[in-house]
A protein has these predicted regions:
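Dinucleotide-binding Rossmann-like beta1-alpha1 core, especially the glycine-rich loop
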Residues: 62-138, 142, 151, 266-267
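Short beta-strand to alpha-helix junction loop
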Residues: 72-81, 106-115, 154-173, 292-297, ...
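Flavin-dependent oxidoreductases
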Residues: 31, 191-280, 284-293, 304, ...
């Protein structure tokens, strides 16, 4: 089977203009490309960096949200609710790891405790009816390692954790196998719009397209301005996180959330599908859209807050630290808007819920394309896809004696922290969209 992926130093393909070009190959952009692959349209996915999922999509808390705390009636609330169901079903069919661990919003003082009933009411307005209030005794039963002083909690049983990396990989792989073209190392610097056609000036040459979708994440406002708009500004909000060793996994059984504030959901402690424990994120509004470094001050803040939430966690070994940037816009809702006269759709302001909502956003955008003059026709089913199992809740290759007997490479552990085998690395290098080494 043939598919088209181009990189720096390779020519862009010629031929007629694309019907649709999607700018940005994060989880939202790849989801849109996958959705469009179901239709008979010639589609390109354009990415400035050298790989998919290289921005916010690769550095987040990896939570599959229920949408219980979204603004009721907002577009985000609807798309998160729909996306959670759609992505959970898709993950089950493709092998993307998901664990339904539930979440606890823990109240540490009387003011936070008094806020929990309002959060329960908000969840019900968002059509989530499984939330329930817990007293301090029940909370201690569920999470015996919590720090002293917890007064109660709101339980959200259906909050889950998911793999944030294989999700866009699955979307992109299916899109490529269905005929979507992926152009990496392809930064858009100018857009010329004429009758019936956009011409994108990129770092690798021109790309012509009839319809344009802006899913550029942190840079969505810049792309929007190239089309003559100034409707939102993206402020990069850095979130630093600490990854603790797998030996810490038994210390926590739920996603432990603080009572949220206007700045975000705050610092959490969460298990991961890989068997580690996350602590973070910070919330730092910056000017630099490339500032993904961890800082001593930020990590010290996290350790201080983590010591109160789960004191024993701070004594565990740290596997890694990382930081990601979220696309804050100052608006409470997603900035998704179609411009029929320009044959253009802006998909901006997609914050931490973007992973959960990605498939629903893609379906919503496909619907908006009709308003910009594109007849998609009837959808077709995409070929099934199964990804390698990375979650610790399932049998990994290093545990599969029969698999190792057939292929000893799966018994050769290369990374002992994450238990990665030579066979898995070989498979990744032979995949439709292999990782790129320097």
């Amino acid at each position: 089977m043939t598919y088209t992926v181009t990189r720096a130093g390779q020519p862009l393909p010629g031929g007629p203009p694309y019907d649709v070009t999607v700018i940005g190959a994060g989880v939202v952009g790849t989801a849109i490309a996958r959705e469009l692959a179901r239709y008979r349209v010639r589609t390109a996915l354009v990415e400035a960096s050298d790989d998919i999922g290289n921005g916010t999509s690769k550095a987040n808390t990896a939570i599959l949200h229920t949408g219980f705390d979204a603004v009721p009636g907002s577009l985000e609330a609807r798309l998160v609710r729909e996306g959670q169901r759609t992505l959970a079903a898709y993950a089950a069919g493709t092998g993307i790891p998901v664990e339904r661990v539930g979440a606890l919003l823990v109240a540490w003082d009387e003011e936070q405790l008094a806020a929990l009933p309002d959060l329960l009411a908000k969840a019900e307005k968002n059509d989530y009816h499984a939330a329930r209030l817990l007293d301090a005794d029940r909370l201690a039963e569920l999470e015996p390692n919590l720090g002293p002083g917890a007064l109660g909690a709101l339980e959200i049983p259906d909050e889950s954790v998911i793999c944030p990396w294989t999700t866009p990989l699955a979307f992109a792989t299916q899109a490529l196998l269905a005929g979507v073209h992926l152009h990496l190392d392809c930064r858009v610097t100018h857009i010329g719009s004429g009758p019936g056609l956009h011409t994108l000036t990129t770092s690798r040459g021109p790309i012509r397209t009839r319809q344009l979708i802006n899913a550029a994440g942190l840079h969505a406002d810049e792309i929007d301005r190239l089309l003559g708009h100034d409707t939102f500004t993206v402020t990069p909000r850095r979130g630093q996180l600490i990854v603790f060793d797998k030996l810490a996994r038994d210390l926590v059984h739920h996603i432990l959330l603080p009572v949220p504030t206007a700045a975000g959901k705050g610092v959490l402690v969460a298990p991961t599908v890989f068997g580690n424990v996350l602590l973070g994120p910070t919330s730092e509004d910056l000017d630099d859209k490339t500032a993904t470094e961890s800082t001593g001050h930020g990590l010290a803040q996290l350790r201080e807050k983590g010591r109160r939430i789960l004191p024993r966690l701070i004594d565990e070994e740290v596997t890694a630290v990382y930081a990601g940037l979220r696309a804050a816009t100052g608006h409470e809702d997603y900035r998704i808007k179609e411009y029929p006269d320009l044959r253009y759709i802006a998909v901006g302001g997609i914050r931490s819920t973007g992973l959960t909502a990605s498939m629903a956003i893609a379906q919503h955008v496909a619907g908006l394309l009709a308003r910009t003059g594109l007849d998609l026709g009837a959808p077709t089913e995409l070929p099934p896809l199964t990804l390698p199992g990375l979650g610790e809740a399932t049998d990994r290759p290093y545990l599969d004696a029969a698999l190792i007997a057939r292929d000893p490479a799966y018994g050769t552990v290369v990374c002992h922290c994450e238990r990665v085998t030579a066979g898995e690395i070989r498979d990744a290098l032979d995949s439709v969209l292999p990782p790129r080494s320097a």
